[in-house]
Amino acid sequence: MHAVLALETSCDESAAAVLRRHADGRIDVLASRIASQVEEHARWGGVVPEIASRRHVEALPGLVEAVVDEAGVTLGQLDAIAATITPGLAGALMVASVTGRTLAALHQRPFLGVHHLEGHLASVMLGDVPQQAPYLVLLVSGGHTELILVAEDGGMTRLGRSHDDAAGEAFDKVARLLGLGYPGGPAIQAVAETGDATRFRLPKGRISLPGGGFHPYDFSFSGLKTAMLRTVETLRQTTDSLPLADLAASFEQVVADVLVQRSLRCAADHGVQQLVMVGGVAANRRLRQSMLEQGNQRGIAVSIAPLAFCTDNAAMIGAAALMRLGQNAACTSFESGVAARWPLDQANALYTPDPPF
């Protein structure tokens, strides 16, 4: 049995959590707290890195104290302390990294520097039915849209990706276009509930292959964003009031269609019977319902991260750290820094005596 304190400050959510992993692989979230900066950044239409870093410094100490007290543990009783160290906003990442390394050194605990995307992949382990590899992961968030095959030995292979905007980024930009505010995902979902998703025909962006045809698993959302812009411009020439509900529903539907169709095709083509969906956009109701229904029709078992752990949180970072501890991974060097970008398939390099950054 292992227990960890986990910290997350990669973007605009300050978070801390304490988790415990049982011998049979079950993970208990003993305490989890998040301090969101959404309202403050909404004034600017997006995340302001300097503001995010300052708010993390203010919020994180109180969050750590709260989760440790709620979990009924002391830092000295934990097996390790974990923090996100890549990818993300460099200044924001430093807050969790420095805090985690300092606490680990003071209490003589191992430190685990976790890849943020590995945390998202581990978030499905916080549900009722932990997944056993092999399975295909659709990671769909504000910064990433990727299809990742997780092998039985834990190895990860990327089979599909977005070549421009991530799905979550497209939601934010279209929400801004429609005057719906930030963050875009929840704003569009709320307005789309009463809309006609078939009113506007929008493109399902595809990526051309050099020899002809299209890549079956890759994504492109920039063309969809442009199509929405042109549709709105045309409507404004003919009406004083935009049909916001229909526009939002049509956009939301085409994003869901693209993600579901290409993900399930990828799983079927690779003979994978399990598909896991994680990331902030995985909280979207239309996408969740469509993925579950169509997966069932095609005989592919679909698991989705619990709603509470779809968006950025520390529990998912703790889950990833616990899985590393279960694999007897080495700890992260106290000399390690942070990196705004780092490939997920090189996450093992974070657990070596010589840090990659």
From Swiss-Prot:
Keyword tRNA processing: yes
Enzyme class, broadest EC rank: transferase
GO MF annotation, one: iron ion binding
SUPFAM superfamilies documented for this protein: Actin-like ATPase domain (SSF53067)
Record-linked PROSITE patterns: GLYCOPROTEASE (PS01016)
Pfam families: TsaD (PF00814)
Cofactor, free-text remark: Binds 1 Fe(2+) ion per subunit.
Cofactor (UniProt): Fe(2+)
Record CDD domains: ASKHA_NBD_TsaD_bac
Annotated positions binding substrate: L139, V140, S141, G142, G143, D172, G185, N284
Localization in the cell: Cytoplasm
Known EC number: 2.3.1.234
UniProt keywords, alphabetically: Acyltransferase, Cytoplasm, Iron, Metal-binding, Transferase, tRNA processing
Annotated InterPro entries: ATPase_NBD, Gcp-like_dom, KAE1/TsaD, Peptidase_M22_CS, TsaD
One Gene Ontology CC term in the entry: cytoplasm
Catalytic reaction list: L-threonylcarbamoyladenylate + adenosine(37) in tRNA = N(6)-L-threonylcarbamoyladenosine(37) in tRNA + AMP + H(+)
Keyword ATP-binding assigned: no
UniProt record, GO biological process: tRNA threonylcarbamoyladenosine modification
Annotated positions binding Fe cation: H116, H120, D312
Family that this chain belongs to: Belongs to the KAE1 / TsaD family.
Functional description taken from the UniProt entry: Required for the formation of a threonylcarbamoyl group on adenosine at position 37 (t(6)A37) in tRNAs that read codons beginning with adenine. Is involved in the transfer of the threonylcarbamoyl moiety of threonylcarbamoyl-AMP (TC-AMP) to the N6 group of A37, together with TsaE and TsaB. TsaD likely plays a direct catalytic role in this reaction.
Name of the protein described by the UniProt record: tRNA N6-adenosine threonylcarbamoyltransferase
Species, as recorded: Synechococcus sp. (strain CC9605)
Name of encoding gene: tsaD
